[in-house]
UniProtKB/Swiss-Prot annotation:
<feature type="binding site">
    <location>
        <position position="242"/>
    </location>
    <ligand>
        <name>Mn(2+) 2</name>
    </ligand>
</feature>
<keyword id="KW-0479">Metal-binding</keyword>
<comment type="similarity">
    <text>Belongs to the arginase family. Agmatinase subfamily.</text>
</comment>
<dbReference type="InterPro" id="IPR020855">
    <property type="entry name" value="Ureohydrolase_Mn_BS"/>
</dbReference>
<dbReference type="InterPro" id="IPR006035">
    <property type="entry name" value="Ureohydrolase"/>
</dbReference>
<protein>
    <recommendedName>
        <fullName>Guanidinopropionase</fullName>
        <ecNumber>3.5.3.17</ecNumber>
    </recommendedName>
</protein>
<feature type="binding site">
    <location>
        <position position="150"/>
    </location>
    <ligand>
        <name>Mn(2+) 2</name>
    </ligand>
</feature>
<dbReference type="InterPro" id="IPR023696">
    <property type="entry name" value="Ureohydrolase_dom_sf"/>
</dbReference>
<feature type="binding site">
    <location>
        <position position="240"/>
    </location>
    <ligand>
        <name>Mn(2+) 2</name>
    </ligand>
</feature>
<feature type="binding site">
    <location>
        <position position="126"/>
    </location>
    <ligand>
        <name>Mn(2+) 1</name>
    </ligand>
</feature>
<keyword id="KW-0378">Hydrolase</keyword>
<dbReference type="GO" id="GO:0047972">
    <property type="term" value="F:guanidinopropionase activity"/>
</dbReference>
<comment type="function">
    <text>Catalyzes the hydrolysis of 3-guanidinopropanoate to beta-alanine and urea. Possesses low activity against 4-guanidinobutanoate. Has no activity against arginine and agmatine.</text>
</comment>
<dbReference type="GO" id="GO:0046872">
    <property type="term" value="F:metal ion binding"/>
</dbReference>
<dbReference type="Pfam" id="PF00491">
    <property type="entry name" value="Arginase"/>
</dbReference>
<dbReference type="GO" id="GO:0033389">
    <property type="term" value="P:putrescine biosynthetic process from arginine, via agmatine"/>
</dbReference>
<keyword id="KW-0464">Manganese</keyword>
Length: 318
């Protein structure tokens, strides 16, 4: 163990329900340059078109992340021994101004990126990923592994509104931040607005693995396809909790039945080990619609799964 690496509070010494909540019970930091991986909340759901409440996601995920321990039980990755990890607090948001929130979030992540820190974020609705991409993808477009029930490549909602949680990846592709040929979406399902709903994703070259295809392929073949698509370049992972069946993640804005199990999601994320990861997020945890903290626990657990991968990625580039 490196003695100068921040460590979580020990639950054998300080009970999980005690102390000030931070992600993974790690120390809080204000300077991203002090860290190699920064844990960040984005408490904003101004792009939500159905059930609001994801603005409360970061706080509840912080609470439930107290259940995470120090070492991954399968991979044996000990992220806090590999790199310096800490809680960078929440990105600034404006709850009554969508465009100002996008600017504020982008500015925050530009500082994180300039410091060379890999961000691991908790939303917030899925629109928060767009300003993160604006900060991380300016130098070169990123590849992406995207877990979701929805493609989030729609164009406009409610007239001519280009910014909702259903549009972030269309905007990111249009702005040259996301490479569609290095993008794979896993778990897509549910009814659609029109037969052409997936036309943009299909025509620009995104590899879409609908839930039905995932069931046929299984975890290993799906992972092989995902790794083929993103290749060796810089890659971002975006995990929307509604990729899970509502039985496992009821507290979300736009639930869809017929989703994957929490174990399948864990296996898929673990299978991304070794990719050139530059950041990740967990979004759409909506505590007002949660049951017994189940979805917040999903968010915290998937955050730890992603942290283990990002820690290895940061250690390789150190």
């Amino acid at each position: 163990m490196s003695n100068d690496h921040p460590q979580p509070l020990d639950a054998a010494e300080i009970p999980r329900f005690a102390g000030i909540p931070t992600f993974m019970r790690l120390p809080a930091f204000t300077d991203p340059a002090a860290l190699q991986v920064g844990l960040i909340g984005v408490p904003w759901d101004g792009g939500t078109t159905n059930r609001a409440g994801a603005r409360h996601g970061p706080r509840e995920v912080r609470n439930l992340s107290s259940l995470m321990r120090k070492v991954h039980h399968v991979s044996r990755i000990a992220p806090y021994d590999l790199v310096r990890v800490g809680d960078l607090g929440d990105a600034p948001v404006n709850p009554i101004d969508l465009l100002d929130s996008l600017r504020r979030i982008e500015g925050f992540y530009r500082q994180v990126h300039a410091a060379g820190t890999l961000p691991l974020s908790v939303g917030g609705d899925h629109l928060v990923t767009l300003p993160i991409f604006r900060a991380l993808g300016r130098e070169r477009p990123l590849g992406m592994v995207h877990f979701d029930a929805h493609s989030d490549t729609n164009d406009r909602y409610f007239g001519d509104n280009p910014y909702t949680h259903g549009t972030p990846f269309r905007r990111a592709i249009e702005e040259g931040l996301l490479d569609p040929l290095r993008t794979v979406q896993i778990g897509i399902r549910g009814s659609v607005y029109s037969p052409d709903d997936d036309a943009f994703a299909r025509e620009c070259g995104i590899r879409v693995i609908h839930m039905e295809e995932f069931v046929e392929l299984g975890v290993e073949a799906t992972l092989a396809e995902a790794r083929r698509v993103v290749g060796a370049g810089p890659t971002y992972v975006s995990f929307d909790v509604d990729v899970l069946d509502p039985a496992f993640a009821p507290g979300t804005g736009t639930p869809e039945i017929g989703g994957m199990t929490s174990l399948q999601a864990q296996q898929l994320v673990r299978g991304l080990r070794g990719l050139d990861l530059v950041g990740a997020d967990v979004v759409e945890v909506s505590p007002p619609f949660d049951v017994g903290g189940a979805t917040a626990l999903v968010g915290a657990t998937m955050m730890f799964e992603l942290l283990c991968l990002l820690a290895e990625s940061a250690a390789r580039s150190a």
